[in-house]
Amino acid sequence: MSLFAIFYLFLAYLLGSVSSAILLCRLAGLPDPRESGSHNPGATNVLRIGGRWVALSVLLFDMLKGMLPVWLGYYLGLTHFELGMVALGACLGHIFPIFFKFKGGKGVATAFGAIAPISWGVAGSMLGTWLLIFFVSGYSSLSAVMTALLVPFYVWWFKPEFTFPVALVCCLLIYRHHDNIQRLWRGQEDKVWNKLKNKKD
């Protein structure tokens, strides 16, 4: 990697470290997502604690944290491998944010934003897989894990030169969901709409 690419990767990490869930919940007067719901500072948990529009804002911001540095890096002439490392850097920032004591979210939206610019085919396949599994199962975590397992194959089909760096990002996502995987295996993971229903009750 070039010195510029390393510097740019660091900038992507810093952008990823800006936790929109924490900041927007503060602005909206909602509880700290790290201390409420699933204790995960991400869009799904913000939705659980009662902020529909805030959750949508968090989702969009987190996607942009991954998308913008990768897109700009492409036009700056970074290699495929360097772009993959930039995507990984943005995801690492979201998961281990330097501004919030290295305690961040799962990185799903940021990873989607970082991988989506590769091609419309990859973006559509990712989104379609996540939505299908979510509406069938009701588990956000299962949707994320299964999508992460399949994304490298989508990338290999549409843009094979990005397969290795994207696979690294997906491995990071699966690792970040290890607690969810254990709860799913034990049958202890809650469905998203059950939590929303319980909150209304």
Swiss-Prot record:
This is Glycerol-3-phosphate acyltransferase. It is found in: Cell inner membrane. Belongs to the PlsY family. Keywords: Cell inner membrane, Cell membrane, Lipid biosynthesis, Lipid metabolism, Membrane, Phospholipid biosynthesis, Phospholipid metabolism, Transferase, Transmembrane, Transmembrane helix. It catalyses: an acyl phosphate + sn-glycerol 3-phosphate = a 1-acyl-sn-glycero-3-phosphate + phosphate. Probably interacts with PlsX. It is a multi-pass membrane protein. GO terms for molecular function: acyl-phosphate glycerol-3-phosphate acyltransferase activity. It is an enzyme of class 2 (transferase). It holds the Pfam family G3P_acyltransf. The chain crosses the membrane at residues 3-23, 53-73, 80-100, 115-135, 153-175. Its main location: membrane. The gene is plsY. GO terms for biological process: phospholipid biosynthetic process. Catalyzes the transfer of an acyl group from acyl-phosphate (acyl-PO(4)) to glycerol-3-phosphate (G3P) to form lysophosphatidic acid (LPA). This enzyme utilizes acyl-phosphate as fatty acyl donor, but not acyl-CoA or acyl-ACP. Its EC number is 2.3.1.275. PANTHER family: GLYCEROL-3-PHOSPHATE ACYLTRANSFERASE-RELATED, INNER MEMBRANE PROTEIN YGIH. Pathway: Lipid metabolism; phospholipid metabolism.
